[in-house]
């Protein structure tokens, strides 16, 4: 091997980020130098944004699923509550209609006993 032939020699202390892909090392990963200090690859912003995009794509799908389930449950509870209130209002309306009919009959026939106090209405 001659002194000018540098093929196959890695001239760097950043072994984890500078080795070529054919060397079987992971590329573009945060590694550490000989002293244990972190080495950030030159395209670290791309890696971070890609990782953030991946997290943003996976986390919302699970979060959205849970939020959707929670929303459906809350909506069903609200519907049940509204149905109960509607049933109660229908009962009250029926009672009021019956009372209105009684009042109409009482006004049409003045000599009918008043159901509230037992006296005759004249």
UniProtKB/Swiss-Prot annotation:
Induction: Expressed in the intermediate phase of the viral replicative cycle. The keyword Endoplasmic reticulum does not apply. Residues 72-106 form a coiled coil. Keywords: Capsid decoration protein, Capsid protein, Coiled coil, Host nucleus, Host-virus interaction, Virion, Virus entry into host cell. Signal peptide: none annotated. InterPro entries: Hexon_assoc_IX (IPR005641). Belongs to the adenoviridae hexon-interlacing protein family. This protein is only encoded by mastadenoviruses, and may therefore play a role in mammals tropism. Homotrimer. Interacts with hexon protein; this interaction tethers the hexons together. Self-interacts with adjacent proteins. Interacts with kinesin light chain KLC1; this interaction leads to capsid disruption at the nuclear pore complex during virus entry into host cell. This is Hexon-interlacing protein. The lineage of its organism: Viruses, Varidnaviria, Bamfordvirae, Preplasmiviricota, Tectiliviricetes.
């Amino acid at each position: 091997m001659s002194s000018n032939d540098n093929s196959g020699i890695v001239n760097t202390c950043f072994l984890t980020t500078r080795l070529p892909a054919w060397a079987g090392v992971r590329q573009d990963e945060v590694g550490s130098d000989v002293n244990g200090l972190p080495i950030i690859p030159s395209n670290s912003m791309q890696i971070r944004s890609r990782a953030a995009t991946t997290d943003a794509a996976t986390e919302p799908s699970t979060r959205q699923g849970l939020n959707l389930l929670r929303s459906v449950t809350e909506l069903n509870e609200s519907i049940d509550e509204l149905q109960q209130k509607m049933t109660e209002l229908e009962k009250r309306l029926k009672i009021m209609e019956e009372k209105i009919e009684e009042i109409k009959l009482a006004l049409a026939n003045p000599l009918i006993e008043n159901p509230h106090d037992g006296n005759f209405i004249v």
